[in-house]
């Protein structure tokens, strides 16, 4: 499957820089614990840590419900009319809702980030590898939750995804699409296996 695909994630970024308001402080709870309870808590934490290591799986991408009658809308003046995006060779991230059928951009929905993966079809993607990238994208969005929604933050997410795609390529999970319109091998020369001794050699 050599086609570009997109995924949307709901983002909870801070709008502090845009709105000029004060960031709400989260209330912190203080809990006092006796020494006996601390020992019980430590034992339960060790058991939980062991279970987490066994079951560590990629983050499930949260589905975003499709919307009907989406119209292209620009940002309002209260946000400075900014077009927030991060565009790299293989990853495009927009702070907007993009209708997957009509490709209408609704920039007013800045609580959604849309990922467009490999728009030039440079790689051959399977459903499993696309899912891995979308899961990693969801992890990054969750990691940057609360950070200011700026182009810098989106570029950080985009560059991390580029590195992850390079890792998938070097691990052999994806490969170059030799039927692509342009063969430029942007992530290095293709590697092939000689003599099956387990070492990859450059072409």
From Swiss-Prot:
UniProt keyword list: Chloroplast, Membrane, NAD, NADP, Plastid, Plastoquinone, Quinone, Thylakoid, Transit peptide, Translocase, Transport
Membrane topology: Peripheral membrane protein
GO cellular component term, pick one: chloroplast thylakoid membrane
InterPro entries (alphabetical): NdhM
Transit sequence range: 1-21
Catalytic reaction annotation: a plastoquinone + NADH + (n+1) H(+)(in) = a plastoquinol + NAD(+) + n H(+)(out); a plastoquinone + NADPH + (n+1) H(+)(in) = a plastoquinol + NADP(+) + n H(+)(out)
PANTHER family reported in the protein's UniProt record: NAD(P)H-QUINONE OXIDOREDUCTASE SUBUNIT M, CHLOROPLASTIC (PTHR36900:SF1)
Similarity field: Belongs to the NDH complex subunit M family.
Protein name (Swiss-Prot/TrEMBL): NAD(P)H-quinone oxidoreductase subunit M, chloroplastic
Species per Swiss-Prot/TrEMBL record: Populus jackii (Balm of Gilead)
Gene name in the database record: ndhM
